[in-house]
Amino acid sequence: MRDFKTYLSVAPVLSTLWFGALAGLLIEINRFFPDALTFPFFSF
């Protein structure tokens, strides 16, 4: 039961860090390529 309580306290912290980093990455991509429906580095 102790391990389960540890998991319940670690998972929200890790998910908050992950989603915060993902949001920051999306914000930076949107800053360099504003309103881009297709990104220039993905077009072939």
Curated annotation (Swiss-Prot):
InterPro entries listed in its UniProt record: PSI_PsaJ, PSI_PsaJ_sf
GO biological process, one term: photosynthesis
One cellular component (GO) term of this entry: chloroplast thylakoid membrane
Membrane topology annotation: Single-pass membrane protein
SUPFAM superfamilies xref list: Subunit IX of photosystem I reaction centre, PsaJ
Gene name as annotated: psaJ
PANTHER family linked: PHOTOSYSTEM I REACTION CENTER SUBUNIT IX, PTHR36082
Transmembrane segments: 7-27
Family statement drawn from the similarity comment of this UniProt entry: Belongs to the PsaJ family.
Keyword Plastid: yes
Annotated keywords: Chloroplast, Membrane, Photosynthesis, Photosystem I, Plastid, Thylakoid, Transmembrane, Transmembrane helix
Keyword Repeat appears in the UniProt entry: no
Cell location: Plastid, Chloroplast thylakoid membrane
Protein name from the UniProt record: Photosystem I reaction center subunit IX
Classification via Pfam families: PSI_PsaJ
Function: May help in the organization of the PsaE and PsaF subunits.
First-listed, main subcellular location of the protein, grouped into a coarse class: plastid
